[in-house]
Regions:
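Conserved AdoMet/S-adenosylmethionine-binding subsite of the radical SAM
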Residues: 62-74, 83-209
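A secondary-structure boundary/capping signal
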Residues: 27, 78-79
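Residues that line or immediately flank small-molecule/substrate-binding pockets and catalytic motifs
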Residues: 14, 42, 79, 128, ...
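Class I S-adenosyl-L-methionine
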Residues: 11, 24-27, 195, 226-229
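Short acidic, glycine/proline-enriched helix-loop-strand junctions
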Residues: 163, 201-230
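Conserved alpha-helical substructure of the radical SAM core
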Residues: 41-75
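Short, charged low-complexity linear segments at domain edges
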Residues: 2-21, 196
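Canonical Radical SAM [4Fe-4S] cluster-binding loop centered on the CxxxCxxC motif
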Residues: 9, 18-55
């Protein structure tokens, strides 16, 4: 049976989507959240039907990957939100069968779907959006409790991972950051990557119009949690 994965794009060679590894990044189509800072708005809709002209199919991508064995170290499934695709775990198995390590970018909107993917994954980039009780402010949808449960699943799985958050002062204030740091410490996380907002691809004119400026000093030194700004 042919694996079905709706693919919105492919980064053939990336060194940033899985720190320290040369990977191909598969951008899965569709996301249930509407984050204001999203720089891939074209990936939000859940398109159905035949692939568009020039759009990758999973079988074609498998054939391409087969010829890159020994060159690429891994395949990262990003999005959109890849865990919402029914064909994700089958695609991960096929990538592993080709000899590639498998990475995943996710916000954890459905913990059960993340749990199904974790046994097939070598590394996860987990997108923490906001303090759990304020997720709607960033995503436009409820989701804080789902994210909390997904983070707990990820921690308990033992899978190597990175928790990261996109920061813009119009979205997250200093108290928000302090609250998030406390939640991460409570969850047992020891490292948190804060990514300064970049306007490329973002559809929100208000965010693009204001430069983030200097990073808040409130988190530059914190006992028990390493905070890394990018």
């Amino acid at each position: 049976m042919t694996t079905t994965l709706r693919i919105g794009g492919l980064e053939k060679f990336s060194t940033v989507d899985w720190p320290g590894r040369l990977v191909a990044t598969v951008f899965c189509q569709g996301c249930g959240w509407r984050c204001r800072y999203c720089h891939n708005p074209h990936l939000l809709s859940f398109r159905v039907g035949a692939p568009l002209e020039g759009e990758w199919t999973w079988p074609a991508l498998v054939a391409w990957l087969r010829d890159r064995r020994g060159l690429l170290e891994g395949v990262v499934f990003s999005g959109g939100e890849p865990t919402l695709q029914a064909g994700l775990t089958a695609a991960m198995r096929e990538a592993r069968d080709l000899g590639f390590r498998v990475g995943l970018h996710t916000g954890g909107p459905v913990p059960a779907l993340l749990a199904a993917a974790l046994p097939l994954v070598d590394w996860v980039g987990f997108d923490l959006k906001a303090p759990f009780e304020h997720y709607f402010r960033i995503t436009g949808r409820p989701g804080g409790e789902a994210a909390r449960s997904s983070l707990q699943l990820l921690r308990e799985s033992g899978v190597e991972h990175e928790v990261r958050t996109t920061w813009h002062p119009d979205l997250l204030g200093e108290q928000d950051l302090m609250d998030m740091a406390g939640e991460l410490e409570q969850a047992g996380s020891r490292r948190w990557v804060l990514q300064v907002f970049r306007p490329d691809g973002c559809a929100d004119e208000g965010l693009r119009a204001r430069s983030p400026g200097d990073v808040p000093e409130v988190l530059l030194a914190r006992e028990g949690l390493e905070v890394v700004w990018r």
